[in-house]
Swiss-Prot record:
Protein name, as recorded: Rho GTPase-activating protein 29
Function: GTPase activator for the Rho-type GTPases by converting them to an inactive GDP-bound state. Has strong activity toward RHOA, and weaker activity toward RAC1 and CDC42. May act as a specific effector of RAP2A to regulate Rho. In concert with RASIP1, suppresses RhoA signaling and dampens ROCK and MYH9 activities in endothelial cells and plays an essential role in blood vessel tubulogenesis.
Compositional bias (Basic and acidic residues): 919-928, 1229-1241
Keyword entries, A-Z: Coiled coil, GTPase activation, Metal-binding, Phosphoprotein, Zinc, Zinc-finger
Organism: Bos taurus (Bovine)
Protein's gene: ARHGAP29
Amino acid sequence: MIAYKQKKTKKKRVLSTGQLSTDVTTSEMGLKSINSNAILDPDYIKELVNDIRKFSHMLLYLKEAILSECFKEVIHIRLDELLRVLKSVMNKHQNLNSVDLQNAAEMLIAKVKAVNFTEVNEENKNDLFREVFSSIETLAFTFGNILTNFLMGDVGNDSLLRLPVSQESKSFESVSVESVDSSNEKGSFSPIELDSMLLKNTNSVELALSYAKTWSKYTKNIVSWVEKKLNLELESTRNIVKLAEATRTNIGLQEFMPLQSLFTNALLNDIESSHLLQQTIAALQANKFVQPLLGRKNEMEKQRKEIKELWKQEQNKMLETETALKKAKLLCMQRQDEYEKAKSSMFRAEEEHLSSSSGLVKNLNRQLEKKRRLEEEALQKVEEANELYKVCVTNVEERRNDLENTKREILTQLRKLVFQCDLTLKAVTVNLFQMQQLQAASLSSNLQSLCDSAKLYDPGQEYSEFVRATNSAEEEKVDGNVNKQLSSPPISGYGPSDSLEDVVRLPDSSNKMEEDRCSNSADITGPSFLRSWTFGMFSDSESTGGSSESRSLDSESISPGDFHRKLPRTPSSGTMSSADDLDEREPPSPSEAGPNSLGTFKKTLMSKAALTHKFRKLRSPTKCRDCEGIVVFHGVECEECLLVCHRKCLENLVIICGHQKLMGKIHLFGAEFTQVAKKEPDGIPFVLKMCASEIENRALSLQGIYRVCGNKIKTEKLCQALENGMHLVDISEFSSHDICDVLKLYLRQLPEPFILFRLYKEFIDLAVEIQHVNEEQEMKKDNPEDKKWPSSSIEISRILLKSKDLLRQLPASNFNSLHYLIVHLKRVVDHSEENKMNSRNLGVIFGPSLLRPRPTTAPITISSLADYSNQARLVEFLITYSQKIFDGSLQPQDSAVGSAGGIAPQVDPGYLPKSLLSPEERDPERSMKSLFFSSKEDIQTTDSECKSFESTPSFEESERKQNALEKCDAYLIDNKGRLLVDQELESASRKTEDACKTSKLPTLKSDREINGVERHLPRTRIRPVSLPIDRLLLLASSPTERNGRNMGNVNSDKLCKNPVFEGVNRKDSPTVVCSKFDGFDQQTLQKTREKQYEQNDHTAKTGMIVPSAFQERGVALNIRSSGDHPVSITQPSKPYTEPVRSTRQVSERRSSDSCPPASVRTPRTLQPQHWTTFYKPPAPAASGRGDEEKPVTPSVAVPPGTTHAPQEHVLKSVPGSENASAGPVHPVSRPEEKAEERDQPDVPTACQRPRLKRMQQFEDLEDEIPQFV
């Protein structure tokens, strides 16, 4: 219907014959009246012709002045007159005020100014003024075209100026009208002429410096004005956006309102223009206006002060020289007076000598000689004073010449500086007004379209549609009531408007009308119009802007026929009365509710984050999440996340709604790193990722990033918000410097930095090596024999490898966080030309935060101060070589935490065992528990056994440690000699202790615990190709054959892993002490372990060779290949060994499974159960290297009670060594130790221990399917 009426309105609008198409701007509305009335006025036509004739004459006068006299003054006068006439014509006839005409006039002014009149003569006059003549013709042609279009009625909107020419705007007079005097004409002097004119002035330097200072103050005022204006505009745009959003939501709820779609479009235009203005303001504050101008101003101030200081020094030198000249002149005058006195005294003495008698001649001669000597001395002093005066005069002349040269240089430097500053000011000013003009142009076009649309509306149109829709609803209501009475009995309990529920289903005509109406609206929220007006017809709260909270829960909106079901709202944390509770619990109607529904708080200013919440009233005192104050009155609560805050805090709220209950406040800054890292899947704290990503998005080019401090109050607010909202904080509202301060504060307040305290010394030593390499590089650059020296790339590669090894010793979360931070800092360094932050600056900033020693109460020494430079140097090195040090992949996060509170150690992902990398493969391990305990009986039996042996050293513990040792060897071999760090060893030791103490079930534990023994894992992958040839051949043989051949090999492996022979075979293996070994010191063992790591190197694929020391100690090897005869291997000094069971014994045990267990338990012994001992599958006897044969020895069981064994023989297992179960154990050759290290104490007597019911089945299965433990 609206579209139909628009067509009718357009038909009624008939333009008159001479009338132009109208626009909403002021100038074009003026054109309408002029075109319709003024053009037909004869007086106006006569006046227009006179003005055009006058303008034509001025053009001719200017051309004649150029061709005839060619005097600069005359030409400028003619040009001044021409521009005055043109300006008067454009002011009098607004139709001729065109952008093209103004551009042509400016072009003419520029061409005239560009002519150098000193070079003009009769020969080159035409060449020099060719462009001037062309500009004159262009101006005349443009003026003629605009005049023709005006008279013909074809004036376009594009050619007209949007704003009329005013006295305050930039007129032609301000551009071109200048004085006739050439000495005062702006821009007519060359740089040399400017310097020469200033040199003639005695105070030229002071004047130039004064101008530079005034320029700085002027620029400061301009920048201050722009900044304050932009801040006010930014605040205004935010308020406009909030107001527009609230108004748009409110007017969208009312239907059939006049010009609703028009005002919705206007609100959308306000929001869009506000967003564009915010982007423009951000650009102007960054690199379009403020920052370049401030940078130029600071540079001007710096150079001005330097020049002023230099000029003052030169003047002081000149003053000293002039003072010396004055003193020399006074000295000359003084010496001359003394000489005159001595000369007169000599003259009087000669006269006395001539007039005296002969008796006094002798005395007079003596006096005469004395005065003559005094006269000569005075004469000599006069000559010396004259020489000094001449020297001072010469010095004064030289100094004066130097002062003039310095003066000339200073003036030249100041002139260049002023020109550069003017150029910058010009560029940023063009940016400022150009961006504002684009903003205003888009706003003008939007207003134009809105004005045209408003003219098309017919009054009363929406009211007519409302009446028509109401009549249709009434008819449908009557039909619906009749149908209900005929089909079903009346239902009580509904309000008077219950029957209007059926109005939702309208006839086709109503649907078409609704679609036609919605097609012309810009934004209509909620369901169809009838539903909103159904409530509005029976309640005045809608018309006054109130909410629908006064309706009860049993209203029409929750009737069975309503497809918009209302769900009960989440109850508030406060206590309220029954009526208020109903008001608060009722959600808004579908037309009201939405993602940005404000409800009763629509008049409250809200931030972007606050608009994401759905607030309701709060009636009980609670703590505000924004200011952390107590909310007593005027509190609000989100329905979804239950966030509580004051109404006044909604304007500054930065926590976004997560649509689920918000977690409580966490302790983030100053908290343990592991507490925050374990909550993240990759171990990287969320505050690090949020701050780094925000900085990379908008501040990589910001000058002084991470060096300039932010606002302290805003920084504290952001820290508080991160502790309250965590990932849901909107940090885009904060400045980049504030975000940088938060990141630095988090790193600085960590109790232990990313690089752990125990690795501090190693990293400091690495930094010292880096310093030595840098010094060598500098020396090689200075040395002329640099080409003969080898390149330093080898040293750098060595340092890179060492740094990689040290970083691998960090836990996974520390490594990943450090990796993430260093890569982020590398991106900052990549933009160092813009942000002025290179890797050295960032190293100085982040060095003490990432690497610091353990805090002590000792006083600060010089060596501790020297570590600051090493810390900065190390971080600089990590940033510079980040791509080589970090491979780009993060380490997997630990799935369990060690018993001591630390995170389990991590290894490189490429060398992780398969059981560590895929959790799915660990499921078969957990399922194996059913093989051991399938009934409550077994579990109870095991519990009682564990309790009875809790106070006695168990042989089972030794077996478990030995199993873990075998896994450690296999892990080291598979990883090609990669040594695990001390933290990993200590963490694994603590896990072993806790498992020995607290474990009730001696069965398999989780996949990360070291005391669990993996058994009967299905082989899901082929064996690695790095196996020896005989092992590969073994895989191709039958299971029975493998069983027969692998028995001895495994026994030899077990013997090599036995602590009895550790002195021979595992000299360089890491050691640890379990809690049962009382006589050992942890620190001593750790030092011994470090020495052993330094002395020996693990080789991956070396075959095990048992030295001749075995036979010297009485080790007897008896190997039988038959399956019916057991393999017996004995050792005289170790009598308590477990023989390998034969096939007959296996069959006997199988038959015994069917028998029920005896009611009386046999006496317990220290003999370990079979399911916990080392399994002995068949293995080839051949070695993997050459044709050497490996002696096969049994596994010698050593109980944990041997506390007097040397510390080198106490072994420690490594977490993640379960990969030994997936492949064969490759023994590693070890050098022989000393004889005293090989001496072992005797093993105490062990006794048998009863087996569980289900263990026999596992042993039988074990004999059939060989697996490696």
